[in-house]
Amino acid sequence: METIRLTTAQALIKFLNQQYVHSDGEEFPFVEGIFNIFGHGNVLGIGHALEQDPGHLKVYQGKNEQGMAHTAIAYSKQMLRKKIYAITTSSGPGSANLVTAAATALANQIPILLLPADTYATRQPDPVLQQFEQEQSIAITTNDALQPVSRYWDRITRPEQLMSSLIRAFEVMTDPAKAGPATICISQDVEGEAFDYDVRFFEKRVHYIDRKLPSERELKGAADLIKKSKRPLLVVGGGAKYSEAREALIAFSETFNVPLTETQAGKSAVEASFKNNLGGLGITGTLAANKAAQQADLVIGIGTRFTDFATSSKTLFDFEKVKFVNINVSRMQAYKLDAFPVVADAKRTLEALVPMLEGYKSEYGDDIGQLKAEWLKERERLGKVTFDRERFEPEIKGHFTQEVMNEYADALQTEFAQTTALLTINETIDPDSVIICAAGSLPGDLQRLWHAEVPNTYHLEYGYSCMGYEVSGTLGLKLAEPNKEVYAIVGDGSFLMLHSELVTAIQYHKKINVLLFDNSGYGCINNLQMDFGGGSYFCEFRTADEKILHVDYAKVAEGYGAKSYRVSTVEELKAALEDAKKQECSTLIDIKVLPKTMTDGYDGSWWNLGVSEVSDREGIQKAYELKQEKLTRAKQY
């Protein structure tokens, strides 16, 4: 047996360079590069190995472990899970900062490789710097916190363990049904230890991502249910994007006159202008999609997890009559909602169903077009909301008085409505631009209002809805789409939570654009607490003497080296967007908007929340009673 003597870290980097993916006839490297923040736990091991020979790996220095991991997640998601970045961190706090990002990747089923350093395998210097001591077991370290948020987790305490661990990790990351974060913790002393590795371990390794075909039984069962239905409904999830099923979805929808609705993950799988596309459904859905959902007698899930936001906490559909066909590569997801499961690739399944349904037509007739036209009229109205200091009724009604709205207008020096600003952006940026969002009220506005006309240009992280993903993720978008303009659509709350990778983007001349909506508060949660009978309690950004906080975010960005703009009108926003396109550096547009001017929920948008059963507030009592009434019509599981 021929061997090569390498340190554990050198063997790791050599192996990463030899991993390839084969998908739809194309072959390419799976690992694009590696993000790092070096500390004493990884700088002398992985750091030295990369300095010595990174191979084809692109190496970037991050500014926050969670932030750079979110960059890697966004890159993989935008590349349809066909390429990844690895992440190396030091032990202790550096590793702990990966927990939130790992959970984000797991919730969204996105493959990334996490390589946190660990405590000493020999235990000779224990407790080493940044190691805590747990009395119940000396073997427990910070990295154990990553176990529940990793699809695969391992700890390397001997150099030879690396081989079986890496093979297993890549099997998991390249499996469409169970893709997610793989975490390999490497003891910091072991990173530098050498071993005589079998050279065959470093040969080119190709991971085949094949399309799983549906069985004849699955196709017949699905076709029979569709033929019996009168008002079927397509629910397009993220799996439809990863399957690149656009043409198959359009053909199926057109041939059988079936309306198409979208989850956050599925939006932009099919362009918004497609005649049968009714937009997002559920809690943050359009009026058109939710009406169609309530009338459906068969729901055909295409690569969706059917989260509470898609099903309105399992109250959106008429569960007394509706049936489900779930097409999903994941057996677990396909079995949800008592569905007839088709565990197969979305594109291939839809293509196979079309000839089996010859002669079938839904009974919608012109209803789909009428629903869409009704919604487009409402969308147009939302794009023209203007503020009035005397008689203004915001979209979120009954929360703030006119006096409070005027106070915000004065403090933020704006009369700009959020929906007007958002639709102005949609109309002004290039159609092939890619937008990203994750948390706050903006995801709801985007799912309802944003029209994506180019496939895979709408990037929402709504599996974990992690505040702070937006700016970090925009850098990931730019790495995936270097020739397109990329935009973070982010609220002030999420921006404050995490925006460190804006500096990384500036450092490496990777132009990103940050569109920062500032309403001085956690507006989404403020709506929530007040909708359910509470007061406005610690969700507005107010000073100790109750003054509204006014932050100059444009100046913050200028300090980092970005080109920045301050806007509070349609004209200023359009001018800033056009000028930002001309810039070669990263930009930030500080958009001051009024609170309560985001979209509100439409018919069918109820959300099951933990409302207090006992309260002295009448509003909370009524909210609890409504919850109990809604649950009588909800599916229990």
Curated annotation (Swiss-Prot):
Keywords: Hydrolase, Magnesium, Metal-binding, NAD, Thiamine pyrophosphate. GO terms for molecular function: 3D-(3,5/4)-trihydroxycyclohexane-1,2-dione hydrolase activity; acetolactate synthase activity; flavin adenine dinucleotide binding; magnesium ion binding; thiamine pyrophosphate binding. Binds 1 Mg(2+) ion per subunit. Binds 1 thiamine pyrophosphate per subunit. One of its GO terms (cellular component) is acetolactate synthase complex. Its cofactor is Mg(2+); thiamine diphosphate. Mg(2+) binds at D492, N519. Involved in the cleavage of the C1-C2 bond of 3D-(3,5/4)-trihydroxycyclohexane-1,2-dione (THcHDO) to yield 5-deoxy-glucuronate (5DG). HAMAP family: IolD. This is 3D-(3,5/4)-trihydroxycyclohexane-1,2-dione hydrolase. It comes from Halalkalibacterium halodurans (strain ATCC BAA-125 / DSM 18197 / FERM 7344 / JCM 9153 / C-125).
